[in-house]
A protein has these predicted regions:
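Boundary at the C-terminal end of the N-terminal hydrophobic targeting segment
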Residues: 24-31
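Acidic/His-rich structured neighborhood in mature extracellular/periplasmic domains
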Residues: 73-214, 261, 267-270
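N-terminal export leaders
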Residues: 9-13
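N-terminal secretory signal peptides that target proteins for export/translocation
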Residues: 1-8
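C-terminal soluble interaction/assembly domains
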Residues: 235-303
C-alpha cells in the first residue's frame, strides 16, 4: 500500500477522530489528533477570565497587548514540560495553570493575536490555532514531534520569514557565536516523546545539526544598556548563554517598560529563583546577575 501523504493522512484521521471524540470536545478533536480536550487545554477558568478583559486590550498595538496579557499572568507558577502531553501524539496545547519561560511568552502572544478576531471567536479553538501558528514550523502541526520548533533561534527565523515577528538582533549590534544546539540529544531522557520513541533521536540530532550549523547572532550584554531605549514593550527577549566555547539560547521572556521608564524583563522564572512569572529588574541588570549570560536576541511581534 503506498504511503499516505500528510494531507491524505490528516483528512482520514479527521473523519475518524471526529466520530470518536465529538462528545469530549466538539470542533476540536480533529485539530488535536484525537487527544481529549482536557489533555490539550488546561486552565479554562483562567482563559475565561482573560477573555472577560479582552475588550480593554484589543485595540492596543500588538506588542503592548502582548505585554498587558503577560502582566495578568504574573504570579502563575513555573511548570516545565507542559507540552509533553502524550507518549506519541504532538498537538497544539496550553496549560494556563503553569508556565515555563517559552510558554509564558507564547501564551501571551497567541492570546493577543486571538483578540484580532471577532469577539465570538475568542474561544479555546481559536486560541489553539494561534498557538499552532506560532509554535510549529511553517505554522502547521502535523501530529509529529518534529513539526514543533524546538530551538528559539529556529523559531525566530521561521516566524520572521512568515512575517509574524521582526528579528531586530543584527541591526541592534549583534555578533556571531558558534551555536551549541545539542540540548535535546544530550538530555533526551528528559523528554517524554523521545523516551517513548527512540527513533526520534536520530531525527532530532539532524535537526540540531542543521540549527547548529548556522552562527547564533546575539547582542552582547555589554551593549544592552545602550539599546534599551530602542526596545519596546512586548518585544520578545531571548537570553543567550555560554555553553563551553559555544553559545546557546537558554531563556526567554518579554520586555516591559514600567511607569518609572525602566525597561524590565518579564518572564517565567525557574524554581531556583522566583518559581513563577515575575516582572524582574532592568533587563541589563538581569543579564549581569548571571555570569553565564552572554547577551540577547530580540524579536518584535508584527501581527
Amino acid at each position: 500500500m503506498p504511503a499516505l501523504t500528510v494531507s491524505t493522512r490528516r483528512s482520514f484521521c479527521s473523519v475518524l477522530l471526529l466520530a470518536l471524540f465529538a462528545t469530549a470536545a466538539p470542533g476540536i478533536a480533529a485539530e488535536n489528533f484525537g487527544l481529549p480536550f482536557d489533555t490539550v487545554f488546561k486552565g479554562r477558568e483562567r482563559f475565561n477570565a482573560l477573555v472577560a478583559q479582552g475588550d480593554k486590550w484589543k485595540n492596543l498595538p500588538i506588542g503592548e497587548r502582548t505585554a498587558a496579557i503577560g502582566r495578568t499572568l504574573v504570579g502563575t507558577p513555573y511548570k516545565s514540560y507542559t507540552l509533553e502531553i502524550d507518549d506519541r501524539i504532538e498537538a497544539p496545547s496550553v496549560n494556563f495553570n503553569g508556565l515555563d519561560c517559552w510558554t509564558f511568552f507564547e501564551v501571551s502572544l497567541a492570546f493577543a493575536r486571538m483578540l484580532d478576531e471577532p469577539r465570538d471567536q475568542w474561544t479555546p479553538q481559536t486560541f489553539l490555532k494561534k498557538i499552532e501558528l506560532d509554535r510549529y514550523r511553517g505554522g502547521e502541526c502535523t501530529g509529529s514531534y518534529l513539526s514543533r520548533l524546538h530551538y528559539l533561534e529556529e523559531w525566530l527565523s521561521d516566524n520572521d520569514r512568515r512575517g509574524l515577528v521582526r528579528d531586530l538582533t543584527r541591526e541592534l549590534g549583534a555578533i556571531p557565536g558558534k551555536n551549541s544546539a545539542r540540548e535535546m540529544t544530550v538530555g533526551w531522557r528528559g523528554y517524554r516523546y523521545m523516551r517513548h520513541n527512540p527513533d526520534l533521536r536520530a531525527s532530532i540530532a539532524q535537526m540540531e545539526a542543521r540549527v547548529g550549523s548556522k552562527p547564533l547572532y546575539y547582542i552582547p550584554k555589554s551593549k544592552v544598556p545602550g539599546i534599551e531605549g530602542k526596545l519596546q514593550t512586548g518585544d520578545i527577549i531571548g537570553i543567550c548563554s555560554r555553553d563551553g566555547k559555544m553559545v546557546g539560547t537558554s531563556h526567554v521572556g518579554l520586555a516591559i517598560r514600567t511607569n518609572d521608564g525602566v525597561l524590565r524583563f518579564m518572564h517565567a522564572s525557574s524554581p531556583r529563583n522566583f518559581g513563577k512569572v515575575v516582572i524582574d529588574q532592568r533587563l541589563s541588570g538581569y543579564l549581569n546577575e548571571f555570569s553565564g549570560h552572554l547577551g540577547i536576541l530580540v524579536a518584535r511581534p508584527l501581527k
